[in-house]
């Protein structure tokens, strides 16, 4: 199950999910069978991302959202505001920050790239960064079946 949450706020760099959308997400995640792969995506960061500059741009309600995704055993959180590729695992949740495939404006020195997430039938996961600038696939994380369930 994939939930795309709108995090931008008009005329602000910071984002937030807000109580109404948080309640919606809580309800939807709570109704899913445990065996489902659960993915939540939004634009802003849930946690600060290294090498992202002075602006961390985490969600205003990041603590509440982090608690929700950990409590509801969300498998993957996808985000990417600052264009820096990063993968971080907290408990059984993998936070995946995307870089950029086209912009060189803010993080151009890091090259252009995107993430590829391979989910295997045995429950294992491999996450790659495909660096378009170098035409190279880089394994960023690998989790055996015991760590993905």
Segments the model singles out, each with a brief description of its role:
Residues 34-51:
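Short acidic, glycine-rich surface-loop motifs adjacent to enzyme active sites
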Residues 52-122:
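Conserved beta-sheet core of the metallophosphoesterase superfamily
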Residues 10-12, 103, 124:
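Short, acidic Gly/Pro/Ser/Thr-rich loop/turn segments
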Residues 1-9, 39-43, 94-100, 128-129:
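Active-site-proximal beta-strand elements of phosphoester/diester hydrolases
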Residues 120-149:
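A short C-terminal boundary segment appended to hydrolase-like catalytic domains
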Residues 1-36, 55-63:
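Binuclear metal-dependent hydrolase catalytic cores centered on His/Asp/Glu-rich metal-binding motifs
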């Amino acid at each position: 199950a994939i939930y795309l949450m709108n995090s931008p706020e008009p005329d602000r760099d910071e984002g937030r999910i807000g109580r109404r959308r948080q309640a919606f997400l809580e309800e939807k995640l709570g109704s899913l069978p445990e065996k489902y792969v659960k993915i939540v995506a939004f634009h802003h960061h849930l946690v600060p991302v290294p090498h992202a500059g002075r602006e961390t741009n985490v969600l205003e309600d990041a603590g509440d959202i982090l608690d929700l995704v950990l409590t509801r055993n969300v498998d993957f959180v996808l985000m990417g505001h600052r264009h820096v590729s990063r993968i971080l695992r907290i408990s059984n949740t993998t936070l995946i920050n995307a870089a950029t495939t086209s912009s060189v404006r803010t993080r151009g020195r890091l090259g252009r790239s995107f993430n590829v997430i391979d989910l295997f039938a045995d429950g294992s996961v491999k996450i790659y960064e495909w660096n378009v600038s170098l035409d190279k696939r880089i394994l960023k994380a690998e989790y055996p079946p015991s760590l993905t369930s």
